[in-house]
């Protein structure tokens, strides 16, 4: 508030060390990014055990110390949902091999992570998440707690990294300057525009859920 900053984003590494514990449990909200593979499916189970463990540890610490201090860890981050990403699309949908893992991860979130987070009140209610999704999407392919589906960036990521520019902000000229022309140029422009809409929708959902 002092510096007119509304949101601070932390990009945490995929581990369950002490630093991640403190950062996550002192946050107001959190989102879990996942890729469609066995390791992310397994990680959902790990989060389902470790977040409640962290919550218990910090609750005990606050009880035995000055837990009412304005600088103490809140210990109640609210789960907004997950972002399914880094999959290969075909005709606008994930190919079957990726869809299998996306469905398995979605099931693990619904059946394992969500119930465990509900026990410690570290989650936004499902109906509120679904309302935010319905309000900010017209495709109908998302449901709580799926906040967004972001496919692989393919060649756009190389241009993005070279220019230090977000994928959705790459200009037509910058794509041409990378050596693209004809059908490839048009395909990359269409992909860039699609990513722009996806990220706009995700931002709107986050704003809706955290306002």
Which residues does each PLM region occupy?
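C-terminal lobe/tail of nucleotide-utilizing enzymes
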Residues: 64-211
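Conserved catalytic-core segment of NTP-binding enzymes
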Residues: 1-118
């Amino acid at each position: 508030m002092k510096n007119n900053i509304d949101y601070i984003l932390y990009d945490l590494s995929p581990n369950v060390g002490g630093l991640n514990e403190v950062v996550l449990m002192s946050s107001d909200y959190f989102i879990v990014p996942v890729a469609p593979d066995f390791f992310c499916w397994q990680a959902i189970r790990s989060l389902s055990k470790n977040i409640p463990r962290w919550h218990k540890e910090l609750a005990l610490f606050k009880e035995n110390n000055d837990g009412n201090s304005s600088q103490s860890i809140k210990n109640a981050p609210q789960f907004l949902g997950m972002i399914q990403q880094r999959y290969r699309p075909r005709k606008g949908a994930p190919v079957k091999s990726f869809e299998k893992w996306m469905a398995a991860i979605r099931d693990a979130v619904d059946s394992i992570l969500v119930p465990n987070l509900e026990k410690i009140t570290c989650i936004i209610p499902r109906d509120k998440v679904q309302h935010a999704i319905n309000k900010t999407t017209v495709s109908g392919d998302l449901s709580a707690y799926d906040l967004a589906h972001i496919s692989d960036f393919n060649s756009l990521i190389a241009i993005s990294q070279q220019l230090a520019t977000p994928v959705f902000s790459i200009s037509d000229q910058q794509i041409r300057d990378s050596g693209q022309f004809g059908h490839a140029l048009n395909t990359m422009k269409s992909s860039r525009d699609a990513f722009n809409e996806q990220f706009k929708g995700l931002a709107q959902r986050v704003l809706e859920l955290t306002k």
